[in-house]
Amino acid sequence: MLTKTAYMVATAHLDTVWRWTIADTVEKFIPDTLSKNFDLIEKYPNYMFNFEGAYRYELIEEYYPRAFDQIRRYVKTNRWNPAGSEYENGDVNIPSPEAITRNILLGNNYFYEKFKKKSKDIFLPDCFGFGAQLPQIINDAGLLGFSTQKLSWGSVSYTHLTLP
């Protein structure tokens, strides 16, 4: 009998450049994300968390240094994964390949400097498409691939579904 194993890893995506202010990100969304995931890590021994964007880690380091130290401890024990490779999530359709490459370089350099670990993929959870140059950029950056959660936007309506 063939058995298969599925691995699920929790993640959070914070848009620091979209619909709310940096102050909201720093004062509301970062503390909420950290406290909930710190609690889950402590409660569940197999819980692992992916968090992306070196810029958000810089904000944590600046505004919540004790939490940043806790993240470092979790990274060392493989409970927390600096994900995504990029400094900041952004569009990958319009910017030049050079801009995307530098974004990856800045992000992974930060991860290595702070955690002695680099991300192995580019995490694009909220893009409105993926440019044709992306596979070459990913390959040239030495990444294994990319992860996403949104392959289309608004193409499926779930309004007819009801909860039990």
What feature does the model see in each segment?
Residues M1-E98, R102, F111:
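N-terminal catalytic cores of secreted or lumenal carbohydrate-active enzymes
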Residues T159-P164:
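Conserved small/polar residues in nucleotide/adenosyl-binding loops
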